[in-house]
Amino acid sequence: MKTACIQMDMLFAQPEENFAKAKRLIREAMAGGPDVVVLPETWNTGFFPKERLSELAEQDCARVKRELGGLAAELGVNLVAGSVANVRGGKVYNTACVFDRAGNCVAEYDKTHLFTPMGEHAYFTPGDHLCRFRLDGHDCGLVICYDIR
């Protein structure tokens, strides 16, 4: 599986600009013919606007699913939409969504091991399950940053 990992200069607390930049970079990455494109952690807000987190957070990843799921389908590429601050059930999670080539959201994962030295535990709710999914017939898993430890 050929993977394109996108590193982007995120604009702090500016999701509109970051969405536009992410979509542009995903399109540019397609020149390399990837099977999957991966965005970084907290790509839509930067890491992370503590005082405005709830205000800037996605609601059930609705915009990510609509815009990036649509882009995955348009480009015919699997897409790991990094992670975004996401409000679900009144709590804020650090959530990643995974889209297949048809734009279907095949997995959602909430970061389980929050990075205490950066204060994540004071703003995010930890996830409570592992993530496993299939892309192009391959079994895949997903971790976010500190989860790898």
For each feature predicted by the language model, list its residue ranges.
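Extreme N-terminal starter segment of soluble prokaryotic enzymes
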Residues: 1-5
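Short polar catalytic/cofactor-binding loops
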Residues: 7-13
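Catalytic metal-binding/acid-base residues of hydrolase active sites
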Residues: 9, 43, 84-85, 147-149
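Conserved protein kinase catalytic core
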Residues: 13, 47, 114-117
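Short, solvent-exposed loop/turn segments at secondary-structure boundaries
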Residues: 14-18, 121
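Cys-nucleophile CN-hydrolase/nitrilase-fold catalytic domain and related Cys-dependent amidase chemistry
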Residues: 15-16, 24-101, 108
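Active-site catalytic loop in hydrolytic enzyme cores
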Residues: 60, 87-149
